[in-house]
């Protein structure tokens, strides 16, 4: 069955709002849920307030009864869960909200999947694999998270799988690499670079700047996720979502400086490294390649 009536959590956030745009552009009905924390932006949903296929609910995904009412009243036939706390630095300062949203919130959603027999697309992260020195992780590799954020995301995956196994539920799991693009919260690396350059301030660079991440433009990411939802029949599988575009932080900054026509010079300030900073994330993308039916965006084009 093709999914056409979605409960979309985190719809006012960075990636979730792009998923909202895409779902509505395909004519689907979306009941959007967002707790409206600092990482959400009202403008991300305002543009759709006159669309009859969109309803917005300011709600915490931990509110199991509230979510259940939304699902029942709007004939939802699929949940897409982007709702999460995601900033690693924040998880080091305090991890209670990460446990609430990323673990308890997922447990709440899975209770509704069980009670109402609804499939879920759970959005996770490549960070659940932990760092890797050489090679890349595939979907079958074990999880070995090394920070509080990735630990809560790994726990959430286990909760989804446990519910599915125990109660015969359908799901699909997506492990994304580093997204960037329009609407990203200012705390993230690429927006920090842009903000620093525009304000004539130095770009803070952790450690030696050699930490490697795998970058993907947000609109490419949500298109792939949409195709996973529509064409994989919720087969209780995991899909890495990556374009295998690995760059260390120095290279990312240099690309941004080239874009703005600036020299390295005094633009960068090396700062103390993040506690427990993972050196490199890398995932394979063989499993999802056949789902890319569009021209993907290079990093150089994505930052324009």
PLM feature segments, named:
Residues 4-5, 299-304:
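Amphipathic terminal alpha-helices
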Residues 154, 170, 179-192, 199-202, ...:
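Glycine/proline-rich active-site loop of Rossmann-fold NAD(P)-dependent oxidoreductases
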Residues 218, 250, 274-295, 301:
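Conserved C-terminal active-site "lid" loop/helix of NAD(P)H-dependent oxidoreductases
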Residues 66, 107-112, 215, 220-223, ...:
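Conserved mid-core alpha-helix of short-chain dehydrogenase/reductase
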Residues 221, 225, 241, 252, ...:
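Non-catalytic, hydrophobic alpha-helical segments
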Residues 259-283:
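Terminal hydrophobic/aromatic helix or amphipathic segment near a protein terminus
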Residues 155, 159, 163, 193, ...:
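Hydrophobic alpha-helix immediately C-terminal to the catalytic Tyr-X-X-X-Lys motif of short-chain
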Residues 1-179:
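N-terminal Rossmann-like NAD(P)+-binding domain of SDR-like oxidoreductases, especially those catalyzing
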């Amino acid at each position: 069955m093709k999914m056409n009536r979605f409960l979309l959590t985190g719809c006012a956030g960075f990636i979730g709002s792009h998923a909202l745009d895409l779902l509505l552009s395909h004519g689907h009905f979306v009941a959007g849920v967002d707790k409206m924390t600092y990482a959400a932006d009202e403008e991300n949903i305002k543009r759709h307030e006159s669309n009859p296929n969109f309803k917005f609910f300011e709600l915490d995904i931990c509110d199991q009864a509230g979510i259940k009412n939304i699902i029942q009243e709007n004939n939802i036939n699929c949940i897409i869960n982007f709702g999460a706390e995601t900033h690693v630095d924040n998880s080091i300062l305090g991890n209670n909200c990460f446990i609430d949203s990323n673990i308890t919130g997922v447990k709440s959603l899975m209770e509704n999947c069980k009670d109402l027999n609804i499939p879920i697309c759970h959005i996770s992260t490549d960070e659940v694999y932990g760092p890797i020195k050489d090679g890349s992780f595939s979907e079958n590799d074990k999880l070995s998270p090394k920070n509080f954020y990735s630990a809560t995301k790994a726990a959430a995956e286990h909760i989804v799988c446990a519910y599915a196994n125990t109660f015969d539920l359908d799901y699909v799991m997506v492990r994304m690499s580093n997204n960037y693009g329009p609407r990203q919260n200012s705390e993230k690396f690429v927006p920090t670079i842009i903000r620093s350059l525009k304000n004539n301030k130095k770009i803070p660079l952790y450690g030696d700047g050699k930490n490697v991440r795998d970058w993907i433009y947000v609109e490419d990411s949500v298109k792939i996720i949409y195709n996973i939802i529509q064409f994989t029949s919720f087969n209780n599988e995991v899909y890495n979502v990556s374009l295998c575009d690995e760059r260390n932080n120095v290279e990312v900054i240099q690309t941004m400086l080239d874009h703005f026509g600036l020299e390295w010079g005094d633009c960068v300030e090396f700062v103390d490294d993040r506690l427990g900073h993972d050196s490199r994330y890398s995932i394979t993308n063989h499993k999802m390649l056949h789902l890319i039916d569009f021209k993907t965006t290079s990093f150089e084009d994505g930052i324009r």
